[in-house]
Structure formats: structure tokens, C-alpha cells
Amino acid sequence: MIIPAFDLINGRTVRLYQGDYSNQKNYNVNLFNSLEVYKSKGIEIVHLVDLDGAKNSANRQIELLKKIVSHTTVPVQVGGGIRTTKDISTLLDLGVKRVVIGSSIVSNKKQVKQWLNFYGPDAIVLALDVHVDSSNKKEISIDGWQKKTNFILEEIIEYFLSSGLKHVLCTDISRDGTLLGPNFKLYKEICSNFKNINFQASGGVASLQDIIFLKKTGVKSIIIGRSLLEKKFTIEEAVKCWQRES
């Protein structure tokens, strides 16, 4: 499915280039109108990133998220600095459909396993930001991509499989926000290796052709942010393109 994405700072829709807060672009969009339009076009879930919460969990945009959930009918998954059980419970209690866990996957692996077991695999999305090197080694980066780790993508997925892991959002960080096109090879490999995981592809989608090629890799969803905001194509075109390839 197509998952439209909004990155939010102080209630505004923005895009960061390569995760850099000092390199942000503002978009003059009415978030609430957009969500209703997306719902009417058949969108089943929207991806929201709370960039204030990602930077400092004390600044989480709870009131905005509460308003979004109560005023719109399209389900949302929310990411951005979710690091504690309280963070997860607060969001799920608001009515958020899924929470997206990032850096804790590496820094707090056992706790994340407990969350998967407690909240269930449908409520949790693991966000894996990877840097693929010249030898095809897929290294995980954390903390807004500032920090490389020694963890490898495949090892992390294997670790969480026993807890029923179902949803993985995978981003090739060299592509995100660039409109350079996705890393098709990466998605084809991981979909082939982990057939029971619902992969969400993210980063670099610039054209309808990218959607066609991504669908063929085996991903279950494509997250699209900048291309929709900058009207590279319409949501109707994206949805039709996905359905046509089904």
C-alpha cells in the first residue's frame, strides 16, 4: 500500500534533508485537509514523524497528535524519539494505530522485545535506518543517522523474529529526502530473506516508475513524503500505480 508521510516540527509540515535539522524545508499544507483527502482516496494509514519529540522527548507534540487522531478518520503510525514504555502507552492510548521504534532497537534491545510481546507485533514498527557499504554490508545508524553502529540489518531482524516481529520500516539513509530513487537491490534482498515481514520502503521515491519497481521487490508498503508534498505525482496516481501492479 501507499503510506503518505508528514514530518512535523511545531505543528508545521517540513522535510529535513538527510536528517539535518538545520537543513529543513517548510511546506504550506493543511495537514487535516490532506489527511481527509488521503482517506477519501483509499489510503489506509499515514506515517507521522514528530521531529520535536525526536530531538527532545519532553517536547513531544502530544496535543497536535491528539487533535489529529480525534479529528481525522485515517489511521496513523507515529515515530520520533519513542524510547520508553510510557511513550508507547501514551500514543496508543491516544488512538495511534502503530508506534515506530528507532534507536532503542539497538540501545535497548531487550526492552523492545518486551514491547513486541506486550503490545503485540501489530502495534509496533521497527524503523531500521541502514547505510549500505561497497561490500553490501547493511549497517544500522541511530540517533537521527548521526551515529553508525556495529549492528547489521539482518542480525537485528533475526533477533526480533522470535517475538513475532511483523512490521519493519527500512530506509537507505543515503536516499532519504533526495528524490534520487530507492535502493531496489536492498529491498529485493531483504524481502527475499524475510518473507514473513511486512517491509515498508522509505527514501528516495521520485516517480511513479519507482513505485512500480518497488512493488516488484516484494515490499508491502511504500512511504512517500517529499514527492507528494512537491506534487511530483498525485496520491490518486500513486495508489492506482500500486494497485495496477498487484
Swiss-Prot record:
It is found in: Cytoplasm. One of its GO terms (biological process) is L-tryptophan biosynthetic process. It holds the Pfam family His_biosynth. GO terms for cellular component: cytoplasm. SUPFAM superfamilies: Ribulose-phoshate binding barrel (SSF51366). Keywords: Amino-acid biosynthesis, Cytoplasm, Histidine biosynthesis, Isomerase. Pathway: Amino-acid biosynthesis; L-histidine biosynthesis; L-histidine from 5-phospho-alpha-D-ribose 1-diphosphate: step 4/9. Its EC number is 5.3.1.16. The keyword Hydrolase does not apply. GO terms for molecular function: 1-(5-phosphoribosyl)-5-[(5-phosphoribosylamino)methylideneamino]imidazole-4-carboxamide isomerase activity. Its main location: cytoplasm. It catalyses: 1-(5-phospho-beta-D-ribosyl)-5-[(5-phospho-beta-D-ribosylamino)methylideneamino]imidazole-4-carboxamide = 5-[(5-phospho-1-deoxy-D-ribulos-1-ylimino)methylamino]-1-(5-phospho-beta-D-ribosyl)imidazole-4-carboxamide. The active site is at residues 7, 129. It comes from the Bacteria. PANTHER family: 1-(5-PHOSPHORIBOSYL)-5-[(5-PHOSPHORIBOSYLAMINO)METHYLIDENEAMINO] IMIDAZOLE-4-CARBOXAMIDE ISOMERASE. Belongs to the HisA/HisF family. This is 1-(5-phosphoribosyl)-5-[(5-phosphoribosylamino)methylideneamino] imidazole-4-carboxamide isomerase. The lineage of its organism: Bacteria, Pseudomonadati, Pseudomonadota, Gammaproteobacteria, Enterobacterales.
